[in-house]
Amino acid sequence: MARLLFRLLVESNTPSPAIDNSTAALNSDLVVILAALLCALICVLGLIAVSRCVWLRRLAAGNRTVSGSQTQSPQPPVAAANKGLKKKVLQSLPKLTFSPESPESEKFAECAICLAEFSAGDELRVLPQCGHGFHVACIDTWLGSHSSCPSCRQILVVARCHKCGGLPGSSSSGLESEPEIEIRIKQGEDDPNSFLP
């Protein structure tokens, strides 16, 4: 009789397999829920960091325009590159007729806008700030909505100073002039595919 009672007591204290499965399922559900909450927390923190960066940049840009002092860190006007040129300024840019025999033709191989090679008799417009050349129709369309070179993004028209009418960064005396450096590269010398037949 004592053995029977001992056996019943031991069996009642031993957990059944059904109870083990339910606790394991509960633990795995808890792990999935905690992982989802952790991912959500990381996403929220990332969005907060991005919005804070945007807010700080807007605040810094607002302070720069309000104070009016751009002598500390002169930066090129980014908004000016998206306006486009006036027709008067556009017509003042130099044009030339492409001739394969001319020494100037070495600089111009193809139009970076339409990707067509220049042929004899094509009219090209050369941008004075960077020296890049394009078909007249291509670059006129581009410059109708942009104020920068499509190849190097050099801004073509720099805003003049409202007080003195001079260009930014230029000295009023004109005594100090930086020497111009011209670098010429022979055709095929800097071509990464020059090893190909």
From Swiss-Prot:
Keywords: Membrane, Metal-binding, Plant defense, Transferase, Transmembrane, Transmembrane helix, Ubl conjugation pathway, Zinc, Zinc-finger. It is found in: Membrane. The gene is ATL80. It catalyses: S-ubiquitinyl-[E2 ubiquitin-conjugating enzyme]-L-cysteine + [acceptor protein]-L-lysine = [E2 ubiquitin-conjugating enzyme]-L-cysteine + N(6)-ubiquitinyl-[acceptor protein]-L-lysine. Its main location: membrane. The RING-type zinc finger domain mediates binding to an E2 ubiquitin-conjugating enzyme. It is an enzyme of class 2 (transferase). PANTHER family: RING-H2 FINGER PROTEIN ATL61-RELATED-RELATED, RING-H2 FINGER PROTEIN ATL8-RELATED. Induction: Up-regulated by chitin. GO terms for biological process: cellular response to cold; defense response; protein ubiquitination; regulation of flower development; regulation of phosphate transport. May be involved in the early steps of the plant defense signaling pathway. The chain crosses the membrane at residues 30-50. One of its GO terms (cellular component) is plasma membrane. It is a single-pass membrane protein. A zinc finger (RING-type) spans 111-153. Its EC number is 2.3.2.27. This is RING-H2 finger protein ATL80.
